[in-house]
Amino acid sequence: MLVFIGLGNPGPRYVLTRHNVGFLFVDELLKKFQIGSSYRAETYEAFKLKSQSPAIAVKPLTYMNNSGIAVRDLIRDFGLSQNDRLIVIYDDVWIPLGRLRIRERGSDGGHNGVKSIISSLGTQEFSRIRIGIGPKPDDIDMVSYVLGEFTDSELKVLWKVLDLAISAAQEMFAADFKKVMSRYNSIGVE
């Protein structure tokens, strides 16, 4: 089963903030697939996708820094195993806006949501789609930057890169993960 976990913060205050690109990814993914059923737990909401292979899309409801609690609960509730591919989608300040990076595993890269998942699971062995939000300006602290909203011009680029990420996700159903990774890691939008 493919398990797309979009990281973000719940609530209307965070909808279009940089830290919510994972939630925005899930919203866009749900527009491409019909929802077979949905499930809301205390720590997450999950949507079974009507697709060629079993898949779910998930939004943790624990706030970013506690995402690992939601992922741990999800794995328990759905009986997920090592045969299932967890794909965590999140913002990355080290990647320029308009680019994404797909990886099979890796460190937290300083991202607190990913750090929480690694801590809860005890492993870095899960896939990622890192969506670039660009570096923070010198005159603002990191928390203010990632919790700040995208500008109108940034949103235009973001919607394009989210389309790219959705295309990559759709190809993951049929293509080898390494091929998808190789193809999409070299593409950018403006």
From Swiss-Prot:
GO molecular function, one term: peptidyl-tRNA hydrolase activity
Gene3D superfamilies given in the database record: Peptidyl-tRNA hydrolase
EC class: hydrolase
Pfam families assigned to the protein according to its UniProt record, in alphabetical order: Pept_tRNA_hydro
Binding residues for tRNA: 14, 63, 65, 112
Entry's Gene Ontology cellular component terms: cytoplasm
Site feature (Discriminates between blocked and unblocked aminoacyl-tRNA) residues: 9
Site (described: Stabilizes the basic form of H active site to accept a proton): 91
Entry keyword annotation includes Glycoprotein: no
Superkingdom of origin organism: Bacteria
GO biological process terms on file: protein quality control for misfolded or incompletely synthesized proteins; rescue of stalled ribosome
Subcellular localization, as worded in the UniProt entry: Cytoplasm
Main location: cytoplasm
The keyword Transmembrane helix appears for this protein: no
Keywords: Cytoplasm, Hydrolase, RNA-binding, tRNA-binding
List of catalytic residues: 19
Catalytic activities: an N-acyl-L-alpha-aminoacyl-tRNA + H2O = an N-acyl-L-amino acid + a tRNA + H(+)
Transmembrane segments annotated in the record for this chain: none
EC number(s) per entry: 3.1.1.29
Function, in words: Hydrolyzes ribosome-free peptidyl-tRNAs (with 1 or more amino acids incorporated), which drop off the ribosome during protein synthesis, or as a result of ribosome stalling.
Similarity remark: Belongs to the PTH family.
The protein's assembly and partners: Monomer.
This protein's name: Peptidyl-tRNA hydrolase
Gene: pth
